[in-house]
Amino acid sequence: MTKLRKIIHIDMDYFFAQVEEKANPSLKDKPFAVGGTNPKRGVISTCNYIAREYGVRSAMPTAIAMQKCPNLILLNTDFAKYKAASAVIRDIFYSFTDKVEPLSLDEAYLDVTDVKEYKNSATLIAQAIKQEIFNKTGLTGSAGVAPNKLLAKIASDINKPNGLYVVTPKQVDSFVKDLPVKKLFGVGKVSQEKLKSTGVETCLDLQQLSLATLVDKFGKFGSSLYNYARGIDNREVNPVRIRKSVSVENTYLEDLKTLGACLEKLPSLYDKLTSRITEEHYKSIIGIVVKFTDTKFNKTSLTRVAKILDKEMLKNLIIELHQKQNHPIRLIGIGVKLGEIDDKQIDLF
């Protein structure tokens, strides 16, 4: 009999904005956003919940955000500050278990299956982690507790901010049936549109499609979709995963018809990418990459050798790649390629 796993997904609430709010309490009752400080060409990185009440959202052009909320305060990003807070939070994770899989500065998976403290209750452990984070940083995070990574991540988003949601093994079937398929890991806008065209909008709808049908439509990912629709996810929490790259991408609802439109998206993508890169990643960068998907679903990319993440080089890659395009752009991705860390070189510093 397979041992039931106990997985926690912790996702810090409006992390960049919350760190800024903690550093400057006068912001607490005011609508503000981080990033996108150029009112004409900027893009919002994140915002507090007061700003969200006005309709301001992450990745929104600053000009639109200011129309929705004319008194919106704009702050420059301060990654040194965010990384310092993230380091404290990560140490807290490791004080509970060694099985920690960081996803970015503000979220991680923890496998607490074998943790004996707190009556071996994942719910009690999640509560303790949240409390410890608040005690040491003054910041709140939301937690999802479930038998696997898929459901834990979905659960962590349900009661935000400062929430906790638990999906027990007996609740899995009822929990997943009404879930929109867009909540499933790996289902982006393109996959969502493809599923919707066949009448699939919820996991219950997805359960009606056979494994063979899904594999035929989605290839290898079809097998994963078949399992995810049933709340099955066998991915392990991987504390020592060796990453070959770190990347971010965004699919845009409005096609990007000009080079200028593409370049306007770089600041928000860059901020998102740097938030996911750890100190160890910075030491092992061997290249940077830009990729496009156009409206005909043609995929192109360019990679350049680099030892650092350089925004100007990314801009030049976007310009170079755009010259090869024949159709408007639907998706832009940027990232870094990682290699082996040279320990001898690190010791010199």
From Swiss-Prot:
One of its GO terms (cellular component) is cytosol. It catalyses: DNA(n) + a 2'-deoxyribonucleoside 5'-triphosphate = DNA(n+1) + diphosphate. InterPro entries: DNA/RNA_pol_sf (IPR043502), DNA_pol_Y-fam_lit_finger_sf (IPR036775), DNA_pol_Y-fam_little_finger (IPR017961), DNA_polymerase-Y (IPR050116), DNApol_IV (IPR022880), IMS_HHH_1 (IPR053848), Rev_trsase/Diguanyl_cyclase (IPR043128), UmuC (IPR001126). The record marks F16 as: Substrate discrimination. NCBIfam families: PRK02406.1. Residues 7-188 form the UmuC domain. GO terms for molecular function: damaged DNA binding; DNA-directed DNA polymerase activity; magnesium ion binding. Monomer. PANTHER family: DNA POLYMERASE KAPPA, DNA REPAIR POLYMERASE UMUC / TRANSFERASE FAMILY MEMBER. Belongs to the DNA polymerase type-Y family. Its EC number is 2.7.7.7. This is DNA polymerase IV. Binds 2 magnesium ions per subunit. GO terms for biological process: DNA-templated DNA replication; error-prone translesion synthesis; SOS response. Keywords: Cytoplasm, DNA damage, DNA repair, DNA replication, DNA-binding, DNA-directed DNA polymerase, Magnesium, Metal-binding, Mutator protein, Nucleotidyltransferase, Transferase. It is found in: Cytoplasm. The gene is dinB. It holds the Pfam family IMS. Poorly processive, error-prone DNA polymerase involved in untargeted mutagenesis. Copies undamaged DNA at stalled replication forks, which arise in vivo from mismatched or misaligned primer ends. These misaligned primers can be extended by PolIV. Exhibits no 3'-5' exonuclease (proofreading) activity. May be involved in translesional synthesis, in conjunction with the beta clamp from PolIII. The keyword Nucleotide-binding does not apply. Mg(2+) binds at D11, D106. It comes from Francisella tularensis subsp. mediasiatica (strain FSC147). Transmembrane segments: none annotated. Its cofactor is Mg(2+). The active site is at E107. Coiled coil: none annotated. It comes from the Bacteria.
